[in-house]
Design a protein with these regions (language model features):
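Short, surface-exposed, charged/polar-biased interaction segments
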Residues: 22, 78, 123-124, 129-132, ...
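A conditional alpha-helix N-cap/helix-loop micro-motif detector
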Residues: 46, 92, 126, 164-165
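Polysaccharide-binding and catalytic clefts of secreted carbohydrate-active enzymes
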Residues: 1-107, 116-117
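Substrate-binding cleft of secreted/luminal carbohydrate-active enzymes
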Residues: 96-122, 133-204
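P-loop/Walker A phosphate-binding loop and immediately adjacent motor/lid segment at beta-alpha junctions
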Residues: 38-66, 71, 122-154, 204
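Short, glycine/charged-enriched secondary-structure capping and boundary segments
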Residues: 25-26, 81-83, 126-128, 199-201
Length: 204
């Protein structure tokens, strides 16, 4: 793509491992001797992929922007002291993505966590996660964009917190008052067109 098209960046979604049980024990036995566990080996595989892409892409185009949109919860505090005060699927332990390591190494230009939950949602509060990710990038040169779950508003029924534009407006107001956030990304733009009032909200 980079060799043949004048693109500004390359963006990856989050699913590097499937998040379900699968058998790679034979491969681990063959290649994982330097690791204490299969989990560490899997995370290193993903880290190696990200670092390799970063190096290759910037060799082809030093001005290109490379980033990833990981699942919104790196890890829950209950399983990892560096994690967020949440209770959801852990990218670190279930998808084997160590996005904090990518930030530490600088192997991404930006990170765009998928924060597809409402403000005040008990298991994964939007504001709690925004603040966690702000801290995660605070001592790095990695730009932070927040992924917003516009699809939830498109699918919501009357009475749901996501119905209409109110929740998205609350989230945008919170982000506007936050530092170290370069912008937001909607999943998906097509969803916005299905939410009454969204076009007017975005151009206001």
């Amino acid at each position: 793509i980079v060799r043949n098209y004048d693109v500004d960046g390359i963006h990856l979604d989050d699913y590097f491992y499937p998040g379900t049980d699968f058998n790679d024990t034979e491969t681990f036995a063959r290649y994982g001797a330097d690791f204490n566990s299969i989990d560490d080996w899997r995370r290193d595989n993903v880290n190696t992929l990200i670092a390799s892409l970063d190096e290759t892409l910037h060799t082809l185009d030093p001005e290109l922007s490379f980033g990833v949109s990981p699942a919104g919860i790196w890890a829950n505090k209950s399983e990892n002291s560096r994690g967020s005060d949440t209770h959801g699927q852990s990218s670190y332990s279930e998808l084997y993505c160590d996005s904090l390591e990518w930030i530490r190494r600088g192997t991404v230009d930006y990170i765009c966590p998928q924060l597809y939950w409402a403000i005040g949602y008990k298991a994964a509060d939007f504001e709690t996660l925004v603040r966690w990710w702000q801290k995660a990038v605070s001592t790095s040169d990695v730009a932070l964009y927040i992924g917003l779950g516009a699809y939830r508003s498109a699918e919501a029924q009357e009475g749901d917190v996501w119905y209409g534009t109110a929740e998205l407006e609350r989230q945008l107001a919170l982000l506007d008052d936050s530092i170290d956030i370069q912008g937001e990304v909607y999943f998906s733009y097509a969803s916005l067109e299905r939410v009454a009032g969204c076009p007017a909200m975005l151009t206001a």
